[in-house]
C-alpha cells in the first residue's frame, strides 16, 4: 500500500456525545445547587374576600390580593360570582400566591381566621375542598407564614383590599381603576424604591 493511499488523519479533537452530556449534566447540577442556595425573596401579601348576600342564591363574591416587594405594590382581583364569604377568603389567598412568578418567602395577611387556622393545621377541612385544593397548590411552591390581621380597625393595606373586594363584588366584574385605587391608598411609591425584578 502506498503512502498516498492512507486516509488523512482528522486533526480535530474527538469528543464523544456521552462525555459532552456528562459535562452538561454536571454544569446543570451546579446551577441548580446555586439556585437552591440563593435565599428566596420576601413578599408581603394582604388579601381579602367579600360576598354580598353571603349564603344566598344571589350572592356576588370577589377576591383581592395586594402584593408588596421592596416598595413596589400591585393589586390583583377576580370576580367569583356566587360564592360564600369563606370561599372568597380562600380564593383571595390563592390569588395572591398564584401571582408570584417564582418561589418566595411570603408573609400572608388575611382577616380570615378560617384561612389562617386551616392552613396552619389547627382547623379540620369539613367543606370547600375544591377551594382548599386550589390554595394548597398555590402555596406549595412558597414558604408561607399565615398571619391574621384584624379587619375594620383602620389598617391601611387591609382596608384597601377589603374596599376593593367589596367594590368588585358590587360591580360584578374587575374594574382596573378599582385595583389602582387600592394601590394608591397604600401610598406613593418612588421608582427608585421599586425592585426591577418582576416577581408578580
Task: Give names to the regions the model predicted.
Residues 24-87, 98-99, 104, 171-174, ...:
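RNase H-like nuclease fold core
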Residues 43-44, 49-57, 93-162, 169:
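RNase H catalytic domain
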Residues 88-92:
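Loop-to-helix element that buttresses phosphate recognition and phosphoryl-transfer chemistry
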Residues 172-200:
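Acidic two-metal-ion nuclease catalytic site recognized across multiple nuclease folds
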